[in-house]
Structure formats: structure tokens, C-alpha cells
Amino acid sequence: MASDVDTADGETVILNCIDSDGSKLDGDHEEIVISTAEVSQWDLTSLSHRPIIKIKANRQRQIIFSAHSAVFVLSRTIEWKFQASLFFGVDKLLLVCQSWLEYVTSEVSIWPPQLCLEDLVHIWDYGRENAIDFIPQLTGYLARNFIWMASCDSFHNVPFELLLSCVKQPCLTVDSEKHLCDAILLWLAANTNPSDRLSSTGDARPEILTEIRTSLLSLPFAAGKRRCPFFSKFAERSVVAICSLAASRTFILADILGGGDCNQLRIHLTEYTKILDLSGCPQINLPLLLLNMLPSSNNLDKLLMKKLNQLSLKLEHHMDISRISWETFPVLTFEAVQVVDVSNCPMLHLEAAIEFFSKSFPSLTTLKAAYILTFKTMKLYQLLQRCPLLSDIDLTVDSTPVIPAKVSVISSFPAVMLQISTSPNDEIRPDVPAFHFSRQLSNITKLILEGRTDFYDSDLQNIAECCPSLCCINLNACTSITDSGISILVLKCVELHSIFACDTSFGHNCVLSLCRNISRLDAVAMKMADNTNSLAYKLQILHIGGCKGINETSLLELISQTQRIRSLCLRETQLVDNCLYKFSGSSLEMLDVSDTKVSCHAVGHVVRGNPLLKCLIARGCRHLLQEENDILGNSPVLYYELGKSCNLEEISLGWGFSFFSLEALRPAIKMLRTFIVGLGGSLGKDGLKLVPTFCPWLETLILYFQVVSDSVVRNILETLKNLQVLALCYCFGEISSLIFQSSAPRLRKLKLERVSTQMTNDDLLILSRNCMNLTELSLVGCKRLNSESQDTISNGWPGLISLHLEDCGEVTAQGVTSLMNCQALEDLLLRHNGLGIDRNFIIRAASRMPLLRKVAVDVCDAKDGDFDLPDFPDRNFLHIVKIARCNLKRRTLGSTKSGTCTTPVHAETLILTWDSRKLSRTVVKERL
């Protein structure tokens, strides 16, 4: 805001306050004249919307005049010093402004963006300079809104003293300790000279790191920060503490705290907390969570500590939680909490935690509890009863690799039932209803059960009866439910508009239910011309990829009625051109027709009528290749239509996709984020060189069977500054060590499969320095690597959550040693990397890596010829174990009798999958 002083007469002066950005203000644009004699009558809210304000003041009131400081009305700046306020009689104005500041910072409902962070910093500077006592209010306000403050572009300009003061506030409110740590590290990185990052001597700023409760960080985050210059020691201690807590079978406070207080285990949970994010914390168990819901004190009384320890022992021995007296714990209530995320918390007894969520979080609407296998789906009704306001639940687990339509089963073994409860009331038979008989209607609108093989038709029927408001259901890879079970849900939940049912038994009965007129339940409804009352007509999302039970006729009937659909996945179905020609919707944003028999013309027909299309997935469609010569201006009709009408964010193509197709697509891919080219596509080196130019905002680039070279890959890494995922799989043209010298600090996922056979340990070391933030790494066919590469991987990428090594020389010839230091791993595949893996490797890995859910190995690498299989107690967090076995095939060398050699040929794969009820063992032909 600019200001100047005009002389009106001998006794009065006028201060003109002009907003430099007044064009952006709403409201009356006329100037207004006010007087300092009427400060008490000023309407600050109204004044804040005026582009020009004229303030009249009596000259006789001047005592001292100077310039250059700051006072604020809302977020509008007037340049003057504190002493100059007396000239205009603004001492009263200061009181008004201070009163306003007290009001606005005390209002929980005020949304922070109404206040500019830069202005708040100026207010803080002004108050500190002039010893005004509103600083505590201001720091408290920023502490309560710390997440907003950290998200502001000017966060790095916040003075250290102000930041430290905010972090030390008891009311500091953050979603998780990870968010606090990340914000502090970002601030330090922006305010620390590179030469000072390796040493904290002479700098008081690293003291702020001691305010981080490192024992409460998520394991992947803490492990990944072990390479952070000024946080490496803290991160190392954090990982040790987390793994120690996760390994403790019992929660004994005295042992954990060593006689100290509980502050380091106190989650930042305040009366202002809206989101509680504990995801990825294997150290979080029920007693530790309960500790944070009890009244805060430096030391718990002995009786309460004893109760916590007893609770831990009861849960360890799988005691029926209905026998536990929860009322003995005086938990606090946090009214503001609406979202709780405990995904990837394997030690948390979710069933028992629900008891406390219902008491401490009465406003809870969203619960994310993905990858918690111990939660039995039969307890879902208990969750709905205890937390009646819940509207969104996520119980996702990893999808089983044993999808009936995708594998050839050689043999299967009787399921081993998991008996962990001492309660005679806990039924584990799949045919027993999972809910109590006393129905209570739930407010659930969104339910995610992806991958839950312990979910049956009876469970689905009870959901249909108890959740009439259900709008979105995710049943992807729920292989235990049937077509009839899903159809009953569809019939009863008439509010459904989003269905995810990929790789299930979704079939003809479901189609009948969707296409039936919801106001008429007779057979005539299917034949009526007006289908606007059918559920299919109202669908917004329908994902049924991989569902082989839908024939062409049913699919045509279904698609012809989905006129309002926004997202449609039909991959690996019996989809043909006629079905797409029947599609009359115009709101489509995502279409997946991969591995179907559709043609360019049919897909082009859909594209032409849906200009809002942002995502097209059409890999594996061989019929797209047949129309390669059907071109308009050297481009197939499909790509011509895409380039003419769409602004794509994701595209996945294969057969028939060429350099000319890329040229035709150019207008549509300027803002592309994900680009996948699969088998049958042929961009060539020239086409790949154009990708960074055509798609400068790419974040994901995945190439299968493409021709690549050093220059192509280096151009991609050096030009695409936002690239986070790069996969080069089975590509033609060897890439050398030159590409590993390109820096890609934003890269998070890297796959090099059969493209870098000459990679050495030194190359891997260079790669770890230039792509230091990887969280997922897959190397296949790097035959020159040896056991030393384990050190490079564990030291270079300590925060890895996924590691796949296959046909990589002698990496495991001396056993698996250093890789055990990748303690945040969730997915580990080691195959054909050298004979040397110990028999007990799977059990040992599960005990050392608290978050490990998936393991894949090959008997060829087993030092003793086999692997021990974990029992229920030994599996820890394991969900899927795949053990491949090869046969040695004799291969004759030439026509001589000088000798023969053998080569391993895949024979079968043993798959073990655990869920909340049982262990399933299956042998399949495929190498999974």
C-alpha cells in the first residue's frame, strides 16, 4: 500500500492510503474519508475492501514525525513508525488493531489464507521491535496453523526465532511428526550455506531439530533421511528407536522410557487437530496410542502405567477385547479430529483401537487403515457402530497374485485357519454372517476393501442392509465374492455411483442389476426404451477390468446405458468395437481399454464425443495396429481425434503407436504427466528425443521394447526436471555407464530391466549419488554386479520401500547381508542373483524389516536347496510370499560330444498368502 500526506488546511492533514493491488479487491471501489477523531467507529472489515482510504488528522496532535515501519489493518500495510502514530492520533488505532488481532487469532473458524504469512511476519517484527505484548498470540496462532504456514511460498523467509517459538508452543498442531520434520528440514536447507551443512558448529539453528520427536517418525521417512547432511545422526537414532519399539512384543513403559518421561512418545495431538496421520509407523501399538489420549503429564502414575502394561500383555496373548474394561482409562476427547490414518501400522490392534477412537474422536468421518491384515472384516460392523459419523473407510490390502482368470493352478492346499482369539463368539467360517443381527444404519458413503480375500457374500449382503447411503465401493481383487453377491449389493444400494470391481466375479447378474430400472423390479424394465432410472445411467465410475464373466452382449447393454460415466475401465474384457459405438456419454475423463479387441475407429468415436478426456490407456490392443495405413495426414484417426480435441494428462499405448502418432498427438500432450509406451509401439530414437519437448511436465515415463541409447536417456534425465518415475524395460540398444552420470534428484522410482547388462558396482555407486532420493529400484539382467553392490544399495538408498533384483550376477552369492539394513522395505524380490541365501532368510527378513509385506525368491538361490516357511507368529507383517522353482534343462553345445551344460527353466511358483482368517498355499505355472 502506498501512502502520502496532503495538507488540507492549516489545522488538518490527510493521509492517502492507496492499495497498490486494488484491482483485485472485491466490493466498493470508491474512496472513503475517515477521521482519527472517530477511530472507535471505524469498520475495519469494510475499510479492508476499499482501494483508497483518506485519513484526516489534526496537525496540533503531532508530537514526533518520522517514517518507515509498519502497522496493519487486516493484511494492508501503512508505512510509519510507532512514534509517528501520535501525529495522527493512532494510539487508539493501535488498540483497535490489537483487539482485531486478538479476535482473528483466537477464532478457530478463521481460515489462515485470509491472512498473508508475510504480513504476519511483519506484525511479529513490529511487535518485537516495539515490545508489544501480542507476540504470544501470534506465535500461538501460527503454531496452531503450522501446516498452512509450512505450505506458503514465503515459509523459508520466516525468521528462525519465530519458527523456533512456534515449534515449542504446546498448541503446535501438525498432521504427523513427519510433516513437522519435513518442514524444518526444508527451512534449514533454504537457510543454510552448502559449506555449513556438514557441520553444526557455531550455528544455533540445528537446536530446532531437537524439538522433533524422532521416535514417532514414519519408518520410510526416517530411513530416507539418513543421507540428509544435518539430520543423518537424528535419522539414524530414529530408525534404531522405531525398530526397537516395533520389535518389542510387549509394551513395558519402564523399559521403553528407561525411567524418563513420556514426552518423546507424545504425538502432537491438540484440541485443534483435524488430521491424525500415523501411516508407516510400525512402532505404533495400542498402549502407545492410548498414552497420547490420556491427560498429559511428565510422568504417569504407577496405577495407570500398570494398566497400560497389562493391556499390552492381554493383547499379546490375543485375549478377547470384549473382556477388557476400557472405562478404566480416562481418555481425553478431541472434538476437531475428523481424519485418522493408521495405514501400514502392523503392530496396532485396530479392533481395540476402535474402542478409543469412538471415545476420543467423536467427530471422526474418515478412517484409513490400509495394509492391516489383523483386522477381521467380520468386525466391520463394530467399527460402524462405534463411530456413527464415519463416511469413508479404507481397509485396502495387497492384491493376491492368485487371480483365477490370470493364473494356471497346478495344486492348492487346504487353508490353514488362523486361531488367535480365546473368545468362543469369534467365528471364522466364511459362511457365517459377519455382522450382528441388530441392524443399525450407517452413514458410510465410501468403502474400500481392495484385495480383501477374507470378504465373502454374506459380508456384502450385510453391508447392503446397513449402508443405504453407500455411494462408492471398491472390491478390486476381492476374489472370494461372487457375481450374485455383488449384484445384491448393487440392487440394494441405490445411491451407488462408483464401483471398482476389477479382477472379481462381476458378471451377468451384476449387469442385470445395474441396467434394471430402480423404480421397477420386473423383467420388463430391461426392455424399456427409457433407461434414465437405471443405476447404470447414474454411474460416474465403473472399473471392471479383468472380469471375464461378462459376455459381449451384456457388456454392450451395460455400456449403452452409462451415459454419465466419468471413469471407465474395461481392460482384459470381451470388449469389441460394437460396444464402444453404443457408448453415448460425453463426460468421460478416463478410459482403459487395454488388452481388448477394439480398433482405432471405435476408440476414436469415443474420443470425438468426450473432449474432457484426460487419461487413455490402450496398451495391448493388437487391432489398433491393423489400421496403421488408415491415416489422416499421416496420423491414424485415433491420434488425430485426440490431438484435435483433448488435453491429456496420462496416456498408455502400444500396438500401432509410432513417430507419426506422436506428431499428431502433440497438441493434446502439452500438459501430459504420465506417458507409457508398450509392446507394439515404435517411437524410435527420433520420437523419444522429441518426448521432453512435446511433454515438458512429464512425471512418469515407462518404455517397453523401445529403441534407446545413451543420448536418448541422458536427454530425458537432464530435460525432464519433474520426472519422478522412469522405467526402461526390455528395450533394444544397450545403455552405458554414461547415463548414470546424469543428476535426477526428483526421481523416486527407477526400473532398468534388461537394458544395462554392463552395469558394474562403480556404475551403481555413481547412480546412487545422482539419483539419491529413490524409494523404488528394480534391476534385471545386470550380470556384472556382485555382493559389494549390497553395500551400495543399502548406503545409497536407505529409504527404499521396494527392491527387485533379478539375474544380477553374484549379488547374493555370499548371502543377504547389507540389504538387511534397508529396514523400510515393504516389497523385496531376489531371484537368480547367486547361490548363497540362507534357509531362514524369509523369517529373518520379516523380523528385521517391520513393514515387509511381500517377498519373492527362487529356490535356485537357496544355499540349502530350500527355504523355511514362516508360521503365523513368525510372519510378522508378511502378506504374500512367492517361491519360484526351476528345472535344469540340458542344452547341447553344437553337434559335438564334448559335453553339455544346463540352464534353469522356470517350472512353478509356490504362493503363500495370509489374510485375517487363514493361510492359503497355491502352486501355479506362471513365474509371478
For the regions a language model picked out, list residue spans one by one.
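Beta-strand elements of modular eukaryotic interaction domains
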Residues: Q41-T45, I53-A57, Q62, Q264-H268, ...
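Generic preference for well-ordered alpha-helical elements
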Residues: S48, I64-F65, S69-R76, F87-Q98, ...
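Intrinsically disordered, low-complexity PEST-like regions enriched in Ser/Thr and acidic residues
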Residues: L15-S46, I252-L269, S322, V331-L332, ...
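C-terminal capping region of solenoid repeat domains
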Residues: S279, P287-L288, M293-E335, H349, ...
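Eukaryotic basic, amphipathic alpha-helical target segments in cytosolic regions
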Residues: E79-W80, G89-K92, L101, T105, ...
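N-terminal BTB/POZ boundary and linker segment
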Residues: A2-A70, T77
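Alpha-helical scaffold in the C-terminal half of BTB/POZ domains
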Residues: A2-I14, S23, Q60-S66, F72, ...
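Amphipathic alpha-helical repeat scaffolds
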Residues: F82-Q83, V121-D125, T139, S151-C152, ...
